[in-house]
Amino acid sequence: NEAIRDWCCHPADTFYIIGSTVGPHPYPDMVARLQSIISEEIKKQLLEKEGRDYPDYLIACVGGGSNAAGTIYHFIDDERIKIVLAEAGGKGVDTGLTAATIQLGKTGIIHGSRTYVIQSEDGQIEEPYSISAGLDYPGIGPIHANLAAQRRATVIAINDDEAIEAAYELTRIEGIIPA
């Protein structure tokens, strides 16, 4: 927030650079394009291992949205692929301690962008909650908001306990320690 305030107050010598697909145009698109290397790599590896360059499903977590945008970038228009966006459900979507912005957010303005925002009845941005510091953003990028609005993506909320359980299972079964 402070960085964005400084940028707004000093436009002549301050440049807005963020690693998430949020904020005003053209930043969400720039970040998505830069992160698109993820979907390029997915296509390449699938072609090598499976003989086709598209998956059946893409499942990605959504907070600031950069990893999800990179994962789906080269597949967005391919209707064969089902896209699932997993939001940080925190203690539960109905508890008030959540970061499930797509499911609970209402149209508002955050960081120079009109999108879904977790906010009070009078439009004040509320503090989201998640065990994952990288997923507790009170807004959502325009790419993901649009995918949800068009029903191109299925949106689910994963609560903290489910996320921890999945992390342990991934480590135990695959030997991958999630970030």
Where are these regions (language model features)?
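Conserved acidic residues
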Residues: 14-16, 56-59
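A glycine-rich, Thr/Ser-enriched phosphate-binding loop motif common to dinucleotide/cofactor-binding enzymes
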Residues: 26-41, 179
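N-terminal small/polar loop signature for handling phosphorylated ligands or for N-terminal nucleophile
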Residues: 4-5, 39, 43
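Phosphate/pyrophosphate-binding loops at sites that engage ATP/ADP/AMP, CoA/4′-phosphopantetheine
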Residues: 44-53
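Short glycine/serine/threonine-rich phosphate/pyrophosphate-binding segments
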Residues: 61-72, 93-94
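Short, well-ordered alpha-helices that flank and scaffold nucleotide-derived cofactor binding pockets
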Residues: 44, 73, 77
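Active-site/ligand-binding loops adjacent to catalytic centers
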Residues: 2-30, 77-80, 85-174
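Active-site nucleophile and cofactor-binding loops and adjacent substrate-binding regions
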Residues: 35, 58-64, 87, 157-159, ...
